Amino acid sequence: MRELVVSKIKEGTVIDHINAGKALLVLKILKIQPGTDLTVSMAMNVPSSKMGKKDIVKVEGMFIRDEELNKIALISPNATINLIRDYEIERKFKVSPPEVVEGVLKCPNHACISNAEREPITPKFYIKTEEMRATARCHYCGRKIENLDNYIS
C-alpha cells in the first residue's frame, strides 16, 4: 500500500474520521470557498481500520467554532477534532451531536410552520444518533430527516 503524505500544520484545525465522501460538505460548513487565502488539505476515501474509508480535512490558520462543530457532528458523528498549535496537538476530542439543534437544519416539510415566511419561528430539531449517522425530528411538524446533509442551513 502506498503511504499518504500530507504536511503538518503549524496552527489550525484537523478534522479526522469524517464519514467517507463528506469532506466537501465539511468545507461548505466551514465556509471555505475557492479562492480562500487559507491553506487547506483534504483527503477523501482514505483507508481506515475502524471505518473502512474516511475523509480528513486540515485547515491552517482557522480554529473551529461551536456552531461548526455541531453541524459537523450531524453529518459525521464519529469525527475527531485536533486543535494544533506550534505543530503539536493542543487539544483532541470527538464531536458529539447535540440532543437538540435550533437554526441549524431546515425542515423538508414545506407546510411546516418553521418554513412559513410570515412566521418568525426558528427551526428546532431533536437529534438521534445511531452508529455512524444522525437523524433529526422536527419539533413543530414531527417530520423525520434521515439524510441531514441536504438540510443543513
From Swiss-Prot:
Binding site for Zn(2+): 107, 112, 138, 141
Gene3D superfamilies associated with the record: Aspartate carbamoyltransferase regulatory subunit, C-terminal domain, Aspartate carbamoyltransferase regulatory subunit, N-terminal domain
Cofactor binding summary note: Binds 1 zinc ion per subunit.
Gene name of the encoded protein: pyrI
Cofactors required: Zn(2+)
Function: Involved in allosteric regulation of aspartate carbamoyltransferase.
Protein name: Aspartate carbamoyltransferase regulatory chain
Domain of life the protein comes from: Archaea
A molecular-function term among this protein's GO annotations: metal ion binding
Listed GO biological process terms: 'de novo' pyrimidine nucleobase biosynthetic process; pyrimidine nucleotide biosynthetic process
Cell division among keywords: no
Self-association and partners: Contains catalytic and regulatory chains.
Parts of the chain that traverse the membrane: none
Family, as annotated: Belongs to the PyrI family.
UniProt keyword annotations, A-Z: Metal-binding, Pyrimidine biosynthesis, Zinc
GO CC list: aspartate carbamoyltransferase complex
UniProt xrefs under HAMAP family: Asp_carb_tr_reg
KW Zinc (keyword) present: yes
